Regions:
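Juxtamembrane "pre-transmembrane" interface segments
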Residues: 134-141, 146, 222-225, 236-311, ...
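Hydrophobic alpha-helical segments
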Residues: 361, 392-395, 402-463
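Surface-exposed amphipathic alpha-helical segments in non-transmembrane regions
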Residues: 18-35, 49-141, 160-174, 193-232, ...
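Transmembrane helices with small-residue packing motifs
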Residues: 1-11, 33-34, 70-80, 346, ...
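Structured binding elements
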Residues: 3, 124, 428, 857
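Helix-loop junctions and hydrophobic alpha-helical segments within the transmembrane domains
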Residues: 284, 291, 295, 371, ...
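Signature of alpha-helical transmembrane segments and their immediate interfacial
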Residues: 396, 465-519, 919
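Hydrophobic transmembrane alpha-helices and their membrane-interface caps
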Residues: 2, 307-316, 320-376, 416, ...
């Protein structure tokens, strides 16, 4: 939930104390809140973002925040309330941007910005799923009263006189009605109308500021210049070096990105039909491009996996009749899963499609086991297909049910984890669990029917050489496997020692593997921030920005460069900053390079600009979690720590962090040395002369910072009226000599006689995190290191070099990674516990489940070794894969344990029963495992968007 307010003319410190503090005191502790962060800037702007848990209801959260802000309003400055406080619920990342451009010089940036507001913005806001539409770098119309302080003083007027005249003569008022009841003898009533609010610059110029006793009149045009122009010039936006009105589209939480984007594009096609000649629009940035490309790649992988699984099944069963039975289970299970996804409210996204790809290799398992067992009985006992099927199902039904329910026992509990991690697990695990259950239903119903109808006894015809070689290899492998099993089973102590070594190896490798939350993806764009010396004007920043844009446009891999000059995601509104969003060409047009190589080249070239510092960043892996990829650390001034202590701590941390090779892209949000002019008011003298202290401050604010007076009507809308001194009167410290206030006796008193002005420095913006003044440290792990390692190093530096009154917290993606960091153990514990409890209930035994559980660590060791050898990280996807692997290992173990238990119950020897079960189940287990592995192979080899 985002909160925005403004206190024009106020410094960052004033905004922090007068606006941020009372609002945050009320907001703190809102139910479901994870953390809140705010920014107060020297432009008078205040913005706060309250981040809630994914389980929170966004509507209730926004209402709760709104109610709490109402409680804070009594402690806020009147001008802040007059300007309005907005509370909006939205997904925190942009879905897309729309740029209105024109090659006609009459359509300047002010016209484009207001055309977009009047004719485009409101229509887009009404699209279902759109949370907010922001006019970035807006140039909203306003009636600017450019006052001339020297002329006002010559006439004996002050800025308060101007404000009073505007408030008196530019107002809406009801004039009454002729013939309103109770009256008699009238047939009609007539409303009385009059000129209320003014609507043109000419009308404002004619406002009477003072009528003199001699009959002369001083009008507004005598002491000020009036013009209709932009309300603010603090930021500006553009596309590819040209001025443009840039609209940022934000979704409502929970809305479907693809659907919202499609509706926005359709709406823009209709709206653009009414554009004036010479005006057009572009959509340079569209997050759904990455989403659709990723899903397209997954669809390809899905098809490739299906082909490979069918091929493996055919080579294993060696008959098109037998192959048809497991293959039929795939579409039935997947189509059924789609139905349940609809019931659960899931969408087709990367996680659910990943679940479906993995499910392809699993849903054939049960049917393969049925077919293989039926064919084995037909061959060894010479039974008819019907009799063989009947006998096979008598022995298999309970095992099939047990294996499927064990898989569900693995997946379902994990889906109840909280937070973002639980949300990621939930869609994946439930998708697989449903597909597995449906495949079991197919294996228990349709597969036996098909076996009895289409399978044929072996005709004795010699098989082709490929099948013979496969069978020969399988027989040899089975024979060697049984030989190893027979020898190993005679040495239980050695076996348990080896098992202990497996556990130790898992523990060691788990500690050595670097951790992260999610792998970094090429999302098709990156951001560049230009930082000029503090106090630089927008004109100076614009020159450097234009130069950088021209350079980036020459890059063959760049499609668009979108710029917002005068703003930065790290520090907010600041004329010495510029943010460039570099949108790359489609992935297929840059296959011979990577986004990292492109960024390295850009960073190297832009660092040659002596006028500025350059920071490059990739977007966060999960849109909206943080301002960029990498880590986001909050250094907090706690206890009695001052802003100066925080600056010193941030400098210390940055000093040691920049020495570490594991870290890169380090930057701090602190702006501590911004040039400022301090006016030291002589309060005794002010009181002696009878000058209201409020007039001293309001005069200075109105002339140098602008003051909002009231509103006027135009284009069926309401716009604001501002007073500010003309540019030549607010360029230098000496201009304050021309600012006058009235003493109690009516004499005009210059402000310079009431205080001294001197240059100093102070913060340009003040950030707060959970009510503490904070410095945001951004950075990322260097090539070859993980985000988890980078975060550990930052925490280590903080522990060793920062004082006790400086606290450390994480936000954005780093917060979620830290929260999920200890969940691997929890996930595996849940999995093992539920498998054990389920099997104990299934077999009514505490010992039988142990046989299944003992096989699981061996499978987990293979996963850990694979990740370690390939240089991968322990992230959410690894944990998902580990859960999947444990489930499959348990399923395979049950096939052996179930058969062995039946033989033991029938009087068989324990050891021989186990060996016989392993021999009999070797082929189906090998076939199903091979089908699953090859089903995943296309995912392993995939490239392009979403492949990480």
């Amino acid at each position: 939930v985002k909160i925005s307010a403004s206190y024009p003319g106020a410094s960052a410190l004033t905004v922090s104390q007068a606006v941020a503090t009372p609002i945050e005191q009320e907001i703190n502790g809102t139910p479901g809140m994870l953390y809140m962060e705010s920014n107060s800037s020297n432009s008078g702007g205040f913005s706060a973002t309250v981040t809630f848990d994914v389980s929170a209801d966004p509507d209730l959260a926004a209402v709760e925040i709104q109610n709490r802000i109402k409680l804070a309003e009594s402690r806020l400055p009147a001008e802040v309330i007059q300007n309005g406080i907005s509370v909006e619920k939205q997904a925190p990342s942009q879905l897309m941007t729309i740029c209105l451009t024109s090659n006609d010089p009459k359509f300047d940036e002010i016209y484009l910005s207001n055309f977009a507001t009047i004719n485009v913005l409101d229509l887009l806001r009404r699209i279902p799923g759109v949370g907010r539409v922001s006019n970035i770098g807006s140039r909203y119309y306003a009636m600017q009263i450019w006052a001339m302080p020297d002329k006002l003083a010559n006439f004996g007027l002050t800025v308060q006189d101007l404000q009073n005249a505007l408030k008196d003569q530019n107002r809406e008022s009801a004039a009454g009605v002729l013939g309103q009841q109770p009256v008699q003898g009238l047939d009609i009533t007539i409303p009385i109308t009059t000129q209320g609010r003014l609507s043109s610059a000419k009308q404002f110029e004619d406002i009477v500021v003072r009528a003199n006793a001699n009959g002369s009149i001083i009008r507004l045009r005598d002491v000020a210049r009036v013009s209709l122009e932009a309300s603010s010039y603090s930021t500006e936006s553009g596309i590819n070096g040209e001025n443009a009105a840039v609209l940022g589209i934000y979704m409502l939480p929970g809305a479907n990105a693809m659907e919202v984007a499609d509706n926005v594009k359709k709406a823009m096609e209709e709206i653009s039909a009414n554009f004036p000649e010479g005006m057009s629009y572009e959509i340079p940035f569209d997050m759904t491009t990455y989403i659709s490309e990723s899903i397209h790649e997954v669809y390809k992988t899905l098809f490739e996996a299906l082909v490979l699984v069918v091929l493996v099944v055919f080579l294993s069963l060696q008959s098109w009749r037998a192959t048809l039975i497991p293959v039929v289970a795939v579409p039935i299970s997947l189509i059924g899963t789609f139905g349940f996804m609809l019931i659960f409210g899931f969408s087709l996204n990367i996680l659910t499609l990943l679940g479906l790809i993995l499910a392809i290799g699993i849903v054939v398992d049960d049917a393969i086991v049925v077919v293989e067992n039926v064919e084995h009985l037909m061959e060894t006992e010479k039974l008819s297909p019907y009799e063989a099927t009947k006998k096979a199902m008598n022995g298999l039904a309970s095992a099939l049910i047990a294996t499927s329910l064990v898989l569900c026992a693995v997946f379902v509990p994990v889906s109840f984890l909280s937070g973002i991690t639980g949300q990621l697990y939930r869609q994946f695990t439930i998708t697989i669990a449903v597909s597995v259950l449906l495949s079991t239903v197919v294996a228990l119903t349709l597969s036996p029917v098909m076996c009895s109808l289409i399978l044929k006894p072996d005709s004795g015809k010699k098989k082709n050489i490929v099948f013979r070689k496969i069978n020969e290899w399988l027989n040899i492998s089975n024979h060697k496997y049984i030989g190893v099993i027979s020898r190993v089973i005679k040495h239980p102590r050695r076996l348990m020692s080896a098992f202990g070594m497996v556990l130790i190896a898992i523990f060691i490798i788990h500690r050595l593997i670097p951790t992260s939350f999610l792998p970094v993806e090429d999302q098709g764009y990156f951001k560049v921030e230009l930082e000029l010396p503090e106090g630089s004007t927008l004109e100076r920043t614009r020159i450097v920005t234009d130069r950088a844009v021209q350079y980036l446009e020459q890059n063959p891999y760049v499609a668009y460069v979108q710029n917002v000059t005068g703003s930065s995601p790290r520090v907010g509104s600041n004329q010495a900053r510029s943010e460039l969003t570099v949108i790359l060409k489609p992935w297929e047009e840059r296959k011979n390079t990577t986004i990292n190589k492109i960024m390295e080249k850009v960073e190297k070239d832009l660092r040659e600009y002596p006028e500025c510092r350059v920071y490059l960043s990739t977007p966060p892996v999960i849109p909206g979690l943080g301002t960029s990829g990498g880590f986001e650390m909050q250094l907090e001034a706690r206890g009695e720590a001052t802003f100066e202590n925080l600056v010193q701590a941030a400098d210390t941390l940055m000093y040691y962090a920049q020495k570490r090779k594991e870290l890169t892209g380090l930057s701090s949000s602190l702006q501590s040395e911004i040039p400022q002019l301090y006016f030291d008011v002589d309060r005794d003298k002010v009181k002696m002369l009878g000058v209201p202290l409020a007039d001293v401050f309001s005069t200075m604010k109105a002339y140098t910072g602008s003051v909002y007076v009231n509103d006027f009507n135009m284009f069926n809308r309401i716009y604001k009226v501002y007073i500010q001194a003309e540019a030549p009167y607010r360029e230098h410290k000496e201009n304050i000599n021309l600012f006058f206030v009235k003493a109690a006796n009516g004499a005009m008193v210059p402000l310079t006689s009431l205080g001294n002005a001197s240059y100093t420095t102070g913060p340009g913006s003040i950030k707060r995190f959970n009510m503490f003044t904070t410095a945001v440290i951004l950075g990322s792990a260097a090539q070859g290191y993980s985000s988890g390692q980078a975060m550990e190093i930052m925490e280590q530096i903080a522990r060793e070099h920062l004082p006790d009154n400086i606290g450390v917290e994480w936000s954005g993606l780093s917060y979620q990674e830290k929260k999920a960091g200890g969940q691997t153990g929890l996930v595996l514990t849940l999995v093992f516990l539920f498998v054990f409890l389920f099997l104990a209930a299934q077999y009514e035994s505490w010992t039988v489940p142990i046989a299944v559980l003992l096989s699981l660590p061996v499978a987990a060791l293979g996963a850990y070794l694979g990740v370690a050898v390939c240089g991968l990280e322990n992230d959410i996807y690894f944990q998902i894969g580990l859960v999947m692997l444990v489930g499959l290992a348990a399923k395979n173990a049950i096939l052996i344990v179930e058969f062995a238990k039946v033989q033991v119950d029938n009087g068989g020897d324990l050891v021989q029963s186990a060996i016989h079960a392993a021999q009999l189940r070797f082929r189906p287990i090998l076939m199903t495992s091979l089908a699953f592995v090859l089903g995943m192979l296309p995912m392993v080899l995939a490239s392009g968007p979403g492949s990480a």
